[in-house]
Swiss-Prot record:
Pfam families in the record: RNA_pol_A_bac, RNA_pol_A_CTD, RNA_pol_L
Record gene name: rpoA
Taxonomy of the source species: Bacteria, Pseudomonadati, Pseudomonadota, Alphaproteobacteria, Rhodospirillales
EC category: transferase
Region (Alpha C-terminal domain (alpha-CTD)): 250-338
Annotated GO biological process: DNA-templated transcription
Protein name: DNA-directed RNA polymerase subunit alpha
Organism: Paramagnetospirillum magneticum (strain ATCC 700264 / AMB-1)
Amino acid sequence: MIQKNWQELIKPNKLHVEPGADPQRTAIVVAEPLERGFGMTLGNSLRRVLLSSLQGAAVTAIQIDGVLHEFSSIPGVREDVTDIILNIKTLGLRMHGEGPKRMHLRAVGPGEVTAGLIEVGHDIEIMDPELVLCTLDEGAKLNIEFTVETGKGYVPASQNRPEDSPIGLIPIDAIFSPVRKVAYKVENTRVGQVTDYDKLSMTVETNGAVTPDDAVALAARILQDQLQLFINFEEPTAVVEEEKKDELPFNKNLLRKVDELELSVRSANCLKNDNIIYIGDLVQKTEAEMLRTPNFGRKSLNEIKEVLAQMGLHLGMEIANWPPENIEELAKKLEEPY
């Protein structure tokens, strides 16, 4: 059946997020297990989208009282205009709604001028209020008007100059992406006795306008939308599969035989000697009962617990009406392809 192309591939059960020192800005996002090679495929694709395609807000132009171009200096300001612009380019912003919007800065020396002094409307948030923009000497004054817009990726200053721009408007390079850094690594992970599945760990740092896990979710949604075009068939119906699931009042894995679990020889022999045939027989045993089995030790116990956990099962389960009267017939149906 066509759906086997994707249904029989192993997939992560859920995404694990390890928050950094500042959970709003840094985190490690972990996905496992993945088919071999998928870690690199997904990691590289997500990284490129994260760095290039997420929407964000940035300053696209400024006007400074008494300044005509970016190569000027301002009396009483220790930094020249070029240095001030470099600092403004690193300013993290969150904007609610569409732009362009305006922000204003009015400062009097002496002292450092930080982003927290910028006057903003209700629809703009400054993510780095402690960012130092410049330093003023005694008696120095500084007035700046900022133009803020939304966009994606990197847009050079040459594209941020409107045709009817007034004299003194200085366009600047805009870094719209809320994602600052992305790194990923792929390691081996184990499922049962198979040890060559992929584990993808992505370290994501943002400017605070979006959380790292939300950024990854947005990147995945972008990829999903772009790839949808390449699917040239309709999703096959799963009516037969659903009917079969409805026939069973319990997890269908309970009908599998324990010799399908690819256990070590010692563990498999212990189960066979104890007349444990189906997984349904196995999960009803407690840990204490298993350890009383001849030649069955703690190592074998841990191996079985790990394999059962991959199927959402565990030892010590209570299963009503087990075994079913037609267990062999049900087990045979389970082996048949849909």
